[in-house]
């Protein structure tokens, strides 16, 4: 197998890789690094934990060493935590260069960030929203000379969903030069990325991992069928089991909402499990602190929303538990990708209720693998059921007393104001839209009822026997 030197990296970068314990390039690095060094645009799609970040960091650092200036490279990423992680890779691998980087994410002081940008760092790592804000409000820097534009977790950046980056990306793309190298990396190849691949006119290099399954082989994936009302008791039982069986067991539990995340964290702490939470309702400093405590093993359990499902590289994670079955298979792939990284073993357990069977089937179809059922002692779960339900209710009451929902609403309003929207006007629009949808639904129901009545009437008419025609008088006399 070719080494880092054989695929075109300079000796100083090969030495940096050796010091970090990177002995051989991974398949995605073998495929993409030579193409990037040749100056080609690149679209790389590989499993989580396969070394995608180093696949673009290494060639960018080599090109930067040949002609160092700022701003040389812009990296866009969907989450703040991932931005800091990418910056860490640039710093470690680019240490001999005296690399200057700048992280532009929400939740931090904009004035301090603007000052950093004005100093022309070599590499800017940013979330689209905050960088677009700077481009709209500041003229102390420009990006007209950047050589590389990187989109990490490109599927998330380009897909239109609950967080739509389209407007911000348009602002950013208008600010960068047309002549540049564009690198897109993702763990899931979505329809949007396929479309981009087909529309590209400059023949970009495309690399996709050839695998029969979409998750790594070292990952033991199972599901646990549980009734909705006793899900939390099964969760507590699972956590206790893993803590007993595995020494220094490190667990990430994924939930679907900030509120559930906070409640579960409070609940597990009541059961004396060392737990921290990570969700978008937390201040940025609190999020950093939670991640740092989990990474350093001060706390062994991290309960998180999908803000932690992408890109975060915490090699020691042994178990991922999905408290809810993900609604999209690609979310499942990113979640379970937080364990079994870089060749290590890992386990992923998904709690599936009676309402989630179709979601489980969709996941199995996407990853081209059937999940094995995990069997637990139901009697042991029933023993703690009442206690878990009581503790959960106590935590809910405590959270309600802290006005958690009100804070969430205030945060939403703040975000709207930052985006230049009127919160009251937006609420009015939503109410009007809901009213129109309701009217449309009623109209469709009436049309449906009318069509069904007409159909039923025509069926009755068709089912009646034809009436015999009365004989003409002349014919009747002739017969007599």
Swiss-Prot record:
<dbReference type="GO" id="GO:0003724">
    <property type="term" value="F:RNA helicase activity"/>
</dbReference>
<dbReference type="GO" id="GO:0030307">
    <property type="term" value="P:positive regulation of cell growth"/>
</dbReference>
<dbReference type="GO" id="GO:0003723">
    <property type="term" value="F:RNA binding"/>
</dbReference>
<protein>
    <recommendedName>
        <fullName>Probable ATP-dependent RNA helicase DDX49</fullName>
        <ecNumber>3.6.4.13</ecNumber>
    </recommendedName>
</protein>
<dbReference type="InterPro" id="IPR027417">
    <property type="entry name" value="P-loop_NTPase"/>
</dbReference>
<keyword id="KW-0347">Helicase</keyword>
<dbReference type="InterPro" id="IPR050079">
    <property type="entry name" value="DEAD_box_RNA_helicase"/>
</dbReference>
<dbReference type="Pfam" id="PF00271">
    <property type="entry name" value="Helicase_C"/>
</dbReference>
<dbReference type="InterPro" id="IPR001650">
    <property type="entry name" value="Helicase_C-like"/>
</dbReference>
<comment type="similarity">
    <text>Belongs to the DEAD box helicase family. DDX49/DBP8 subfamily.</text>
</comment>
<dbReference type="InterPro" id="IPR011545">
    <property type="entry name" value="DEAD/DEAH_box_helicase_dom"/>
</dbReference>
<keyword id="KW-0547">Nucleotide-binding</keyword>
<feature type="region of interest" description="Disordered">
    <location>
        <begin position="438"/>
        <end position="480"/>
    </location>
</feature>
<dbReference type="InterPro" id="IPR014001">
    <property type="entry name" value="Helicase_ATP-bd"/>
</dbReference>
<feature type="binding site">
    <location>
        <begin position="46"/>
        <end position="53"/>
    </location>
    <ligand>
        <name>ATP</name>
    </ligand>
</feature>
<feature type="domain" description="Helicase C-terminal">
    <location>
        <begin position="218"/>
        <end position="382"/>
    </location>
</feature>
<keyword id="KW-0067">ATP-binding</keyword>
<dbReference type="InterPro" id="IPR014014">
    <property type="entry name" value="RNA_helicase_DEAD_Q_motif"/>
</dbReference>
<keyword id="KW-0694">RNA-binding</keyword>
<comment type="function">
    <text>ATP-dependent RNA helicase that plays a role in various aspects of RNA metabolism including the regulation of mRNA export and the levels of pre-ribosomal RNA. Regulates the stability and synthesis of pre-ribosomal RNA and thereby regulates cell proliferation. Also possesses antiviral activity by recognizing gammaherpesvirus transcripts in the context of lytic reactivation.</text>
</comment>
<dbReference type="Pfam" id="PF00270">
    <property type="entry name" value="DEAD"/>
</dbReference>
<dbReference type="GO" id="GO:0005524">
    <property type="term" value="F:ATP binding"/>
</dbReference>
<dbReference type="InterPro" id="IPR000629">
    <property type="entry name" value="RNA-helicase_DEAD-box_CS"/>
</dbReference>
<dbReference type="GO" id="GO:0044357">
    <property type="term" value="P:regulation of rRNA stability"/>
</dbReference>
<dbReference type="GO" id="GO:0005730">
    <property type="term" value="C:nucleolus"/>
</dbReference>
<feature type="short sequence motif" description="Q motif">
    <location>
        <begin position="2"/>
        <end position="30"/>
    </location>
</feature>
<keyword id="KW-0539">Nucleus</keyword>
<feature type="short sequence motif" description="DEAD box">
    <location>
        <begin position="152"/>
        <end position="155"/>
    </location>
</feature>
<dbReference type="GO" id="GO:0016887">
    <property type="term" value="F:ATP hydrolysis activity"/>
</dbReference>
<dbReference type="GO" id="GO:0005654">
    <property type="term" value="C:nucleoplasm"/>
</dbReference>
<keyword id="KW-0378">Hydrolase</keyword>
<feature type="domain" description="Helicase ATP-binding">
    <location>
        <begin position="33"/>
        <end position="207"/>
    </location>
</feature>
């Amino acid at each position: 197998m070719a080494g880092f030197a054989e695929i075109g990296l300079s000796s100083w970068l090969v030495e940096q890789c050796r010091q970090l314990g990177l002995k051989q390039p991974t398949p995605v690095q073998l495929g993409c690094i030579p193409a990037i060094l040749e100056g080609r645009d690149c679209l790389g799609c590989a499993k989580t934990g396969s070394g995608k970040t180093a696949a673009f960091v290494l060639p960018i650092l080599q090109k930067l060493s040949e002609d160092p200036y700022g701003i040389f490279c812009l990296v866009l990423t969907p989450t703040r935590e991932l931005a800091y992680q990418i910056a860490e890779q640039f710093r470690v691998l680019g240490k001999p260069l005296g690399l200057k980087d700048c992280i532009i994410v929400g939740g931090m002081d904009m004035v301090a960030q603007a000052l950093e940008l004005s100093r022309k760092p070599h590499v800017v790592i940013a979330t689209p929203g905050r960088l677009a804000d700077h481009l709209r409000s500041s003229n102390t820097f420009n990006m007209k000379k950047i050589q590389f534009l990187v989109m990490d977790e490109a599927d998330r950046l380009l897909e239109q969903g609950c967080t739509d980056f389209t407007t911000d990306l348009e602002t950013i793309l208008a600010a960068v030069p047309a002549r540049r190298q564009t690198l897109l990396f993702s763990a899931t190849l979505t329809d949007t990325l396929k479309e981009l691949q087909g529309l590209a006119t400059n023949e970009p290099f495309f690399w996709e991992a050839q695998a029969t399954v979409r998750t790594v082989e070292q990952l033991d994936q199972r599901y646990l069928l549980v009734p909705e009302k006793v899900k939390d008791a099964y969760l507590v039982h699972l956590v206790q089991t893993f803590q007993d069986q595995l020494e220094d067991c490190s667990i990430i539990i994924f939930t679907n909402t900030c509120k559930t995340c906070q409640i579960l964290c409070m609940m597990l702490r009541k059961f004396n499990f060392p737990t921290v939470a990570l969700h978008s309702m937390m201040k940025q400093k609190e999020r950093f602190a939670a991640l740092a405590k989990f990474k350093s093993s001060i706390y062994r359990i991290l309960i998180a929303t999908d803000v932690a499902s992408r890109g975060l590289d915490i090699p020691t994670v042994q178990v991922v538990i999905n408290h809810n079955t993900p609604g999209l298979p690609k979310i499942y792939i990113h979640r379970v990708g937080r364990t079994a990284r870089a060749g290590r073993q890992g386990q992923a357990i998904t709690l599936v209720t009676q309402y989630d069977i179709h979601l489980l089937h969709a996941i199995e179809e996407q990853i081209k693998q059937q999940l094995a059922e995990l069997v637990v002692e139901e009697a042991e779960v029933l023993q703690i059921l009442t206690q878990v339900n009581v503790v959960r209710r106590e935590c809910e009451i405590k959270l309600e007393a802290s006005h958690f929902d009100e804070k969430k609403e205030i945060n939403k309003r703040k975000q709207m104001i930052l985006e230049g929207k009127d919160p009251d006007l937006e609420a009015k629009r939503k109410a009007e839209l809901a009213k129109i949808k309701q009217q449309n639904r009623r109209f469709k129901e009436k049309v449906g009822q009318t069509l069904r009545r007409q159909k039923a009437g025509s069926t009755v008419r068709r089912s009646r026997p034809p009436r015999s025609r009365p004989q003409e008088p002349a014919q009747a006399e002739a017969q007599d």
